[in-house]
């Protein structure tokens, strides 16, 4: 049996990865390590919590002694590292916490893995440290075509008539790092540490940089779930600047699929970009979300457009992110399965049908669930 630690497994992306691995690989023991900060929620995994190949461990990746004990106690063969502080606005207000968790936490985990794996007779053979990062480490791309041009590459799941590019440059795996926010700077630093442990000690590592994710179980401080909830309750929709900033979007289930493929088939010491093969201006996304929520709630489609409220732009707000995922597509055969419009439809339906989850997360009541389930164990 392989013993795999997934850090941040109670979070948004992490919970989807944990669920996929627990269900797909019954011969694996999946250890979900999560500190359970505000964005971690064990209720995300109620459907698999009693599976025999699943274990939850509450812990902080910054606690080196705990990380080493975890490696030794569970005889860990692989690590999928998702635990991170990830909200840009929070990083602007509190950069220290982001450096502590994203940089020092990653270093703590790397060092614990190094010590344990090097103590084994087989050393690093059959081991793997997979670090999940962001496309924000690359900085910003110019929006040279604000009117949109035909996208130079596509997939079956690329957004139909709206599949456009807003510039001629894209982030490649070889693009130089140029982070602009405390969040992206902390992730860039952690990426460098992971690669340094391969180059210096021979640790088998892989790094991926992914575009914006959306889908079920995302904490409602992020754009799409926040706006779904606000539209439902007819609250203002704060839009930075003119809403012209461009992002590439990926449905979270497709990201989990990519992580699975890369963990098992990716080449050691390689970097892979993971993206949705689409670009959207923020204001256009918001309009799609409004129309979808209105329609599914039985309102006149688009009647809540007046909720859009333009606010002062974020400091250092990067104009355009656009990721080229063709390396992953060509080498490992992965590509997104859902068009953006299809993913938004599924996402809006989920949030509207799971209002209790939303209410519990925003009120903090989900912490009671953890206490009831684990405090006496």
Tell where the protein language model's regions lie, with residue ranges.
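C-terminal substrate-binding subdomain of Rossmann-fold SDR/epimerase-dehydratase oxidoreductases
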Residues: 4, 17, 30, 59-62, ...
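The catalytic Tyr-centered alpha-helix of NAD(P)H-dependent dehydrogenases
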Residues: 179-186, 216, 220, 224, ...
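N-terminal Rossmann-like NAD(P)+-binding domain of SDR-like oxidoreductases, especially those catalyzing
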Residues: 1-213, 263, 282, 346, ...
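Short, well-ordered secondary-structure micro-motifs
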Residues: 43, 142, 218, 250, ...
């Amino acid at each position: 049996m392989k013993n795999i630690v997934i850090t941040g497994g109670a979070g948004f992306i992490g919970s989807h990865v944990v669920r996929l691995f627990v269900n797909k690989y019954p011969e694996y023991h999946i250890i979900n390590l999560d500190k359970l900060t505000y964005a971690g929620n064990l209720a995300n995994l109620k459907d698999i919590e009693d599976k025999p190949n699943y274990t939850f461990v509450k812990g902080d990746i910054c606690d080196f002694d705990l990380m080493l004990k975890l490696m030794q106690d569970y005889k860990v063969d692989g690590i999928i590292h998702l635990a991170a502080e990830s909200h840009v606005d929070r990083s602007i207000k509190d950069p220290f916490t982001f450096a502590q968790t994203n940089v020092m936490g990653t270093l703590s985990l790397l060092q614990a893995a190094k010590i344990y794996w090097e103590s084994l007779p087989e050393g690093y053979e059959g081991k793997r440290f997979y670090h999940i990062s962001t496309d924000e480490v690359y900085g910003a791309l110019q929006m040279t075509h604000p009117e949109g041009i035909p996208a130079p590459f596509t997939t079956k799941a690329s957004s139909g008539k709206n599949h456009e590019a807003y510039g001629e440059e894209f982030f490649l795996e070889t693009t130089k790092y140029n982070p602009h926010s405390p969040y992206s700077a902390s992730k860039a630093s952690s990426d460098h540490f992971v690669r340094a442990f391969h180059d210096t000690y021979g640790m088998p590592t892989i790094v991926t940089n992914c575009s914006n994710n959306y889908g079920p179980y995302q904490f409602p401080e992020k754009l799409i779930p926040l706006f779904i909830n606000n539209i439902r309750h007819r609250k203002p929709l704060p839009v930075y600047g003119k809403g012209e900033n461009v992002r590439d979007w990926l449905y979270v289930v497709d990201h989990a699929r990519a992580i699975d493929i890369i963990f098992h088939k990716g080449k050691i010491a390689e970097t892979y970009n993971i993206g949705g093969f689409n670009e959207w201006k923020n204001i256009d996304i918001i309009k799609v979300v409004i129309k979808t929520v209105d329609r599914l709630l039985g309102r006149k489609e688009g009647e809540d457009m007046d909720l859009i409220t333009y606010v002062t732009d974020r400091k250092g707000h990067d104009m355009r992110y656009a990721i080229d995922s063709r390396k992953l597509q060509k080498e490992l055969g992965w590509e997104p399965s859902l068009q953006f419009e299809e993913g938004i439809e599924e996402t809006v339906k989920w949030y509207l049908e799971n209002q209790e989850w939303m209410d519990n997360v925003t009120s903090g009541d989900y912490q009671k669930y953890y206490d009831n389930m684990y405090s006496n164990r």
